[in-house]
Amino acid sequence: MPNGKYAAHRLQQVRKDARWKDTGYSRRTLGLDIKSDPLSGAPQGRGIVLEKVGVEAKQPNSAIRKCVRIQLIKNGRQATAFCPGDGAINFIDEHDEVTVERIGGRMGGAMGDIPGVRFKVIAVNNVSLREMVIGRKEKPRR
């Protein structure tokens, strides 16, 4: 490592090269998280329900978390989304259009005891899932 009166340019260059060893910097600079994200960096996305799936909760909990497998409209990618609320899965059928958002886990990952599920359903056919669960709104008949 140079040190002296005329070493500034070389020191800057060394710093610049060393930054690429930091995974956070390199992923951020190359936009890798946005490229690998099914929603492509958007806060929400719409998708078509392919099937209903039950995801087993991680230890020490014992439950089957009700989720849906969806295909996003914007890019055709598939993802699994959690259906929050008591009996919420009953308001969702195959081929319905759902709106999903991130579930809120740390570093964009899964949350709590649901492994591999990074999204949650917030609306079915443009009607809020929460409103349907508490009985304030009905699912529109197509």
From Swiss-Prot:
Protein biosynthesis found in the keyword field: no
Signal peptide: none
GO biological process terms on file: translation
Cited Pfam families: Ribosom_S12_S23 (PF00164)
Domain of life: Archaea
GO cellular component: small ribosomal subunit
SUPFAM superfamilies on file: Nucleic acid-binding proteins
Transmembrane portions of the chain: none
Its job: With S4 and S5 plays an important role in translational accuracy. Located at the interface of the 30S and 50S subunits.
Listed HAMAP family: Ribosomal_uS12_A
Quaternary structure and partners: Part of the 30S ribosomal subunit.
Family label: Belongs to the universal ribosomal protein uS12 family.
Annotated NCBIfam families: PRK04211.1 (NF003254), uS12_E_A (TIGR00982)
Designated name of the protein: Small ribosomal subunit protein uS12
Protein source organism: Methanococcoides burtonii (strain DSM 6242 / NBRC 107633 / OCM 468 / ACE-M)
Taxonomic placement: Archaea, Methanobacteriati, Methanobacteriota, Stenosarchaea group, Methanomicrobia
